[in-house]
C-alpha cells in the first residue's frame, strides 16, 4: 500500500508507488476524503481549490516520472476551469502541452505515454498538444480555444515558452477586447436561448442555465480581456464591481459550487444537470429536510433565487462593460421624460444619483414611464445599480407607502404594463419589494412534471398571456379569449387576480382560499370598491373551477352546466374567468394547451352563457332537444337516400341519452354506417375532421365484459392518448362507445393512420383479446411517488356511481383500470381522462352489471382491487 500522505501530496510519490493500481486508489481515497469533508461542512471553496492543487501535484510528479522535463522548450499548462484553479469532483482536467516547435518523434512518444497513463487512471483529461503558433492560429478562429488560453496557468516546464504564449495572447491583434466582448455576448445569448431565456427549468443546468456559473465566468472573461482583471476581487479594484456586488457574486458562486459539488459526489459520470433523479439526494447532502418533497423544494427555491441574482448582476455588469468597451467616448442622445428620468439611447435612467433611496415611490414612476413609452427597452446600468441598492436598503415594503400604492394602481391600469413593465419589475425584484406575499413565492417550485415554472415565473407568464388576447394574430389559437378580453372594461381587475391566484402556494392549506383572503386585503388597502373586491377575490378563489369542470366533469350533462352557471352567476364573471383560466393553463406548461382543451372550455363557456341568458330557473326541455337533433340528422340521411322508415327502426334501438349526447351531425355519421353494416361484426369509425378538438373513435359491437379494456389497450399500443370516453349501450345490448383521442403531441390523428387503427381494433374485438405490449415507463416517472387514490363522490340523482381515481400515469394505465372493471363486474358509463404531469386524475361514471349504482361493499371491493393493480411494485 502507498503512504497515506500521498493523498494530500502526490508530489512525494516514490517511483515504486507510481502504478496504475496505486494511483487509482489514491484518487479514490482523495475523492472519498473530499466527500466526507463536504458532508462535514468544510467550505466548498477550500475543497475546489484543494482538488485543483492535488491534481497539480499529481501531474507535476508524473511529468517528472516520464522525464518530459528533460526537454527544455516544452511546458505543461492548465487551461479552462482547471486553469482558473476550479476543479469539482467530476470536472474535466484540461491541459495544454505547449512547445516552441513541433515535438520530435521521441518527445511525442514520451508525451503520449504520459497522456495514456492519465487516461488509465480514469482521469477525465481534455488535452491538446500545440506549438505557440498553433495556439494563436487556432485561437483566432475558435472562441472557446481563445477563452481557454486567457485562463492558462503553467504547472511545470519551460517558463520562457509559457511567457512567450502569454505575450502573443495579450497582443492587440489576438482577439481585441471589442471583438472578444461582442463574441462572448453572442455566445451567452445563444446559450440562454437553449434554456428558453429563463432561470426556471425543471431540470436546470448548474453551469449553463441563465444565471448559472457560466454567467459568472463570462463576466470574468470579459474583465480579464479588457481590464486585465484576473479575479472577481480585481474587478472590484478596477471599479467595475462595487464591494457589495463583489460579495454578492462570491456568495452566489459559493452557493452554486456547493450544489454542484453535492451533485458530483452523487454521480459516476460528469453532468451538471439537476435531474429529478438526483434532486432528492443533492438536497439531502446539502442538509435540506422536510416532509415528502419539502427538502427538494426548499433547495430548488434557494437555487432559483441564486440564479436570479447572478443573472441580474450579469446583465447589469455586461451593460457597464458595453459602455466602457464599445461606447467609450461616444455621445448618446438623451430625451427628458420628467425631472427624475430621461431616456439615453433606448434605456431609461434616473437623473439623480440617490433618487430611489430618497423617494422609494419613484421606483414605480420609472416603470410607469416604461409602460407608457414603447421606445424604452430596459434600464440603464447605473440606474439599475441604484435600484438594487435602494431595494436592499428598504426598511418597509413599498405597498406600505401611500404614494406607491397610487402609482401601482396607475401602473396596472396601463394597457402596455402587461407586455413589458411587469416582466422587468419581476426580473429586478420590484414586485417582491412591493408585495411581501410575492417575495414568498419567488423561486417556489413543485417537485412534479406538471408545473414547468416556479410560482412567480408562472404568474408573470400568465399576466403576459392575458396581453396576448389583445392581439388578433392569436385569434386562431384563442378564439374566445381574443373576442372576450378586448371588451373587458376593467382589465386591471383581471391583472390583480392573476398576481394573487397562486400567491399562497407553499404555505400548506388550500392556496385558492388563502389567496382570496390576501387578494381581499390588497383590494381594501388599495381603495377598490366592494364589487371590484368581491370579483377579484372570487376569481382567485375559483381560478381552477372552469378548468376542473371542463376536464373532469360531464359538461354535456345539463345538471353539470347548471351547477357551474349557478357558481358563476353572471356573464361578466364568466368572461373574466375564461380569460384567467386559459392564460393560467398556457402559463403552467406550454404543452398543455391543445385543440381538445380549447374545445372543452369553449363548449362549457357557450353552454353556460346560454344557461345564464335563459335564466337559471328555466331548464331546457329534454324532449325538445332530442326531437330537434333527430329532425336535423334525419334530413341529412334522407338527402343521402335513406328511407325514413329504416332510420326510425334503427333509432328505436337507442336510448334517449344517445340523442342528447351527440350532435345531429354525429347521429347522421353513425347511422349512415350502421344502416349498411353487418351487425355480427365490429364497426369502428374514426372522424376525418377534428371533433371537439380531437379524433373521435366510435365503437359499435355486441357488448362484452372486457370490451373497454381491449379498446383502450389497442389505442395505447398505437401510441394514442384517450382524453374522454362516452360509454353507452343500445336497448338490445350493443355498444355505442365514443373515445376522444389525440396523438402524443396533443394533435388529431392524421387520416393516413385511420385504416391501421381501425383494423387493429376490429381484429382485437373479433378475438376479444388484446396482446399486451409492455412499455417502459419514461425515465422521469421513475422518480415520482404518486399514491393511488380512489374516491367515490356523491351524486344528486343517486342513479349512478361517480368515482375519481388518482394514480401514477404509467403506460397502459387505462387498460389495467378496464381489466379491473371487467373482473369486478362494473360497467363504465363515461370517463374523463386528465393527465397532470406525472399524475393521472381520472373521473368515471359507473353502474353494476344490472345497471344500478354500486353498493358500499362493491365500492370498497373495487377500490381495493384498483389500488392493488395500480400501485407500482418495487
UniProtKB/Swiss-Prot annotation:
The HD domain, residue ranges: 455-577
Domain ACT: 696-779, 802-874
Summary of activators and inhibitors of this protein: Uridylyltransferase (UTase) activity is inhibited by glutamine, while glutamine activates uridylyl-removing (UR) activity.
Coiled-coil regions, chain positions: none
E.C. number: 2.7.7.59, 3.1.4.-
HAMAP family linked to this entry: PII_uridylyl_transf (MF_00277)
Similarity annotation: Belongs to the GlnD family.
Protein name per UniProt: Bifunctional uridylyltransferase/uridylyl-removing enzyme
Species whose genome carries this gene: Photobacterium profundum (strain SS9)
